[in-house]
Regions:
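Divalent metal-coordination and catalytic microenvironments
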Residues: 24, 34, 44, 65, ...
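Divalent-metal (often Zn2+) His-rich catalytic cores of metallo-beta-lactamase-fold enzymes
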Residues: 80, 198-251
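Metallo-beta-lactamase
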Residues: 37-39, 57-69, 93-147, 153-221
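Conserved beta-strand hairpin/beta-sheet module of binuclear metal-dependent hydrolase folds
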Residues: 1-55, 158-167
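Metal-dependent catalytic neighborhoods of phosphoester/phosphodiester hydrolases
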Residues: 71-80, 96-97
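C-terminal regulatory/interaction regions
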Residues: 240-303
């Protein structure tokens, strides 16, 4: 299938095929979906240079959401001229990222700088707040954002010429190993929400994309399998929670149980240790354990 975009591999933490940026050419320069984290700016520069471009050629960056692996370099690119398109709930945190960075610091601790690098604020005049289904027209490119919470409340998937750039609501699926039909859900705190994710999945189905392109790491043309896999994972996660959480495990105990659950799925799908490491780099199990614990306590424990 022919596409009007290019996949740029940011080689996050020296692990290929874990974080992508998607590049589009138009008559006045380049547009990107995602910026990647600040730590991968050198990899982004290398990819641009190989194509004869510089940071100054980037006119627009469309963010699926503001988590550091997707939006961390947006401020850097904005200061070199790019307009940053973002969900209205996420926009204030791009301009004033102190709360976002404090929250991330609680999660990542001493690993913050190594993993994510510098997160610069985006100048307010470089932020374009985008509403649900409001077309973004850049030269001869037209993108349509779809409000798709579940991974985060401020999440957009973008439709472009029948292709869905699904951010994280489309799951994590890496083109590695012997089996590329393996999908995991990234479920971080504080905004993972099972029911909202189900509603977003319905919306993705209704969009009827011809291909689906998760940030971790596309594209894929077996759209029906992919969307069905998301639904199976949501069902499996709910079953896991209902089996495990009534005993009120600590987050550490929950993480151990979730690790075992993930390894069982690896065995089922024939996932080798190197591929598992790549999945853990893109979507660490310990982070999902924290997200699941928070979701259960806030939304399910009192039911």
């Amino acid at each position: 299938m022919a596409y009007r975009f290019e996949v740029l591999d940011l080689n996050f933490q020296n692990v290929p095929h874990t974080i992508a940026v998607y590049l589009f050419r138009h008559d006045k320069g380049l547009a990107l979906i995602e910026s990647g984290p600040g730590s991968t700016v050198p990899a982004l520069e290398k990819a641009l240079t190989a194509r004869g471009f510089t940071f100054g050629d980037i006119t627009d960056v469309l963010l699926t959401h503001i988590h550091l692996d997707h939006a961390g370099a947006a401020g850097f690119l904005a200061r070199r001229g790019a307009t940053i398109h973002v969900h209205p709930v996420g926009a204030p945190h791009m301009i004033h990222p102190e709360k976002l960075l404090k929250s991330a610091g609680r999660i990542y601790g001493d690993m913050m700088d190594t993993l994510w690098g510098e997160f610069l604020p985006v100048p307010e005049e470089k932020v374009h707040v985008v509403q649900d289904e409001e077309d973004i027209v850049i030269g001869d490119l037209r993108f349509t954002p779809l409000d798709t919470p579940g991974h985060a409340y401020h999440h957009y998937a973008y439709m472009f010429e029948g292709v869905c750039f699904s951010g994280d609501v489309g799951g994590v699926r890496l083109p590695l190993g012997n089996n590329t039909r393996h999908l995991r859900l990234p479920m971080p705190p504080p905004e993972f929400h099972l029911e909202k994710w189900r509603a977003s999945l319905t919306r993705l189905r209704e969009a009827a994309p011809r291909a689906i392109v998760p940030t971790h790491f596309g594209p894929y043309e077996d759209v029906n399998w992919h969307l069905d896999a998301i639904e199976r994972e949501l069902d499996d996660v709910e079953g896991f929670l209902e089996a495990v959480m009534p005993s009120q495990p600590s987050v550490e105990e929950l993480e151990r149980k979730l690790d075992g659950w993930v390894l069982e799925k690896n065995q089922r799908d024939g996932i080798d240790p190197e591929t598992h490491h790549a999945y853990e780099t893109a979507n660490p199990t310990w982070m999902s354990a924290s997200g699941l614990a928070r979701y259960w306590k806030k939304f399910r424990q009192s039911q």
